[in-house]
Design a protein with these regions (language model features):
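Surface-exposed amphipathic alpha-helical tracts and adjacent flexible/coil segments at the periphery
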Residues: 1-30, 108, 320-362
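An N-cap/entry alpha-helix motif that binds or orients negatively charged groups
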Residues: 1-29, 405-423, 427-455, 459, ...
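C-terminal catalytic subdomain
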Residues: 272-281, 286-333
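Alpha/beta enzyme core
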Residues: 1-270, 276, 282-295
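Short hydrophobic alpha-helical segments that form membrane-spanning helices or hydrophobic packing faces
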Residues: 20, 299, 389-393
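C-terminal helical cap(s) of enzyme catalytic domains, especially alpha/beta-barrels
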Residues: 84-85, 142-143, 149-160, 302-327, ...
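C-terminal non-catalytic accessory extensions
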Residues: 446-498
């Protein structure tokens, strides 16, 4: 993006740059969130009353940055919240967001929340350097009756706490009443709003209901009020949404919230896979980003089950980078597919080292490859030498990817884990037979025994006639299945959505 494009998008409210003036004096590297830029990923972390502490949360921060999280939210509800926040802000290179109400009620009941407590807490966190606040000001008194028919009610911590406050006092949401004063604090320190969705659906059964949409309409009004104060704002979204409702939800938000960047949690597209919700939500996140979301809040395997640990943070970041990257490719974001194409060229050239270097997680890719065949041959353990389609294709014709110097397979390339016996493979390429190569590459001696011809697996390259090839594929008494390849009758000729 050019400087002029960034200025125009920020001025229109379609792009935000969460960068607190006080955080800029530390290690912050500012970034932008909006439809004009690539899709961003947020990682949540924070100590709970029963688990973790400051050191562990700082370690999670570093781990999230390692796995390309674009922002991090500190959602601590236990321990020394102030010290934990200070430590995270001092170490982070990415924008940090918080939910100030968590600090407001430490040591007191939600019913005791007052205007003074709200403004003092927001001011203190802004002075510390927090880059964006999640404020659940869109939950109003008139929305509370709408959740009575829900299966799971209110699943947002901030939303449920403020609903309890309103019922106790018989008054409108105090965050809504204090909105303009909070805006002044944000303007002073350049804190961005992430307007919280306190009535987001917590299950597919509650998706797109009156409570969710009613709050979203109020959020659109709050966004306009923030803009009038010169404060940047993005909007948080659901949650749990069936696949067929995601596009509608994204487009509705853009209309009701005047194009402000949408920041969604998932959404999960099914509720019955606890332990795998980083996958169920990444599916929804990909669709959400394609249809309008600007930032995706990751979900880890621990979602609904417990506090994420270090490896859970990695799993969530990787799943959501896949979702964001996939959407950017589909949207045609310039340069988003470059690495994919380069990796395909390396794969076509059978250049393993470049293949690993271009991958998102080179160490994991190399480990999986070396598990069965820790030598860089012109095939892998999945197919072996004779069944390698890429190798066979290269025998038929030369691909463009194999002609460039950077993708050419260097036969001297080898894994750092090679032993002397395996190193002979690379020294004698073109001399040894495939059987001898397999024997040398075997992790254990005797794994491939070429002397015992009776145990040798039949290979298609050993046969040339059709009758003999069919015998290999058939067990006694069986017949080959002929596939029907005519056009299916129920495929749509035109997709009205597209």
């Amino acid at each position: 993006l050019t400087p002029e494009q960034v200025r125009d998008e920020v001025a229109s409210g379609r792009l935000v740059i969460p960068a607190n003036r006080n955080h800029l004096t530390k290690k912050l590297d500012p970034m932008a969130i909006g439809r004009a830029s690539r899709t961003k990923v947020n990682a949540n972390m924070g100590a709970s009353p029963v688990s973790s502490g400051t050191d562990e949360e700082v370690d999670k921060l570093k781990w999230a940055e390692r796995w390309t999280a674009d922002t991090v939210m500190d959602l601590s509800t236990g321990g020394d919240l102030d010290a934990c926040r200070e430590a995270i802000l001092g170490e982070s290179t990415v924008p940090i967001g918080t939910v100030p109400i968590y600090s407001m009620i430490i040591g007191r009941k939600i019913e005791d929340l007052s205007r003074e407590i709200i403004l003092d807490t927001c001011r203190h966190q802004a002075e510390q350097g927090v880059d964006y606040f999640t404020i659940h000001a869109g939950v109003l008194q008139e929305h509370i009756p709408l959740v009575r028919d829900r299966v799971i009610g209110i699943v947002s911590r901030g939303g449920s706490l403020l609903a309890k406050w309103m019922i106790h006092h018989g008054r409108q949401n105090i965050m809504y009443e204090c909105w303009d004063d909070i805006c002044e604090i944000c303007r002073e320190h350049d804190v961005t709003f992430s307007v919280g969705d306190g009535l987001r659906p917590g299950g597919l059964a509650d998706a797109s209901d009156a409570a969710q949409i009613g709050e979203l309409s109020t959020i659109g009004h709050l966004v306009e009020r923030a803009w009038r104060h010169g404060v940047q704002a993005m909007v948080e979204g659901p949650g749990h949404v069936p696949v067929d409702q995601i596009e509608w939800n994204m487009k509705l938000q853009r209309r009701l919230c005047h194009g402000a960047p949408f920041y969604v949690l998932g959404p999960l597209v099914t509720d019955m896979f606890p332990g795998y919700d980083h996958i169920t939500s990444a599916i929804g996140a990909t669709m959400a980003a394609y249809h309008g979301a600007s930032m995706l809040c990751y979900v880890t395997p621990k979602e609904h089950l417990g506090l994420p640990k270090r490896d859970d943070v990695k799993q969530g970041c990787v799943a959501y980078r896949i979702a964001a990257h996939s959407a950017d490719i589909a949207l045609g974001i310039p340069g988003s597919r470059d690495n994919d194409d380069e990796l395909t060229k390396a794969r076509a050239a059978l250049n393993w080292q470049r293949h690993f270097d271009l991958s998102f997680d080179p160490d994991l890719a190399r480990a999986y490859h070396d598990e069965d065949l820790d030598v860089d041959t012109d095939f892998c353990a999945m197919c072996g030498h004779d069944w390698c389609s890429v190798r066979i294709s290269k025998e038929i014709q030369e691909f463009a990817s194999g002609k460039t110097e950077e993708n050419a397979w260097e036969r001297s390339k080898r894994s750092a884990a090679l032993n002397d016996e395996q190193r002979k493979i690379l020294e004698q390429r073109g001399v040894l037979s495939p059987e001898e190569i397999h024997k040398l590459a075997a992790k254990k001696k005797g794994k491939a025994d070429t002397k015992d011809k009776a145990t040798k697996a039949a290979c298609h390259s050993d046969y040339v006639d059709e009758e003999e090839a069919r015998k290999i594929q058939l067990a006694p008494g069986e017949t080959l299945v002929e596939l029907r390849t005519e056009e299916a009758h129920n495929l749509p000729k035109h997709d009205p959505v597209i």
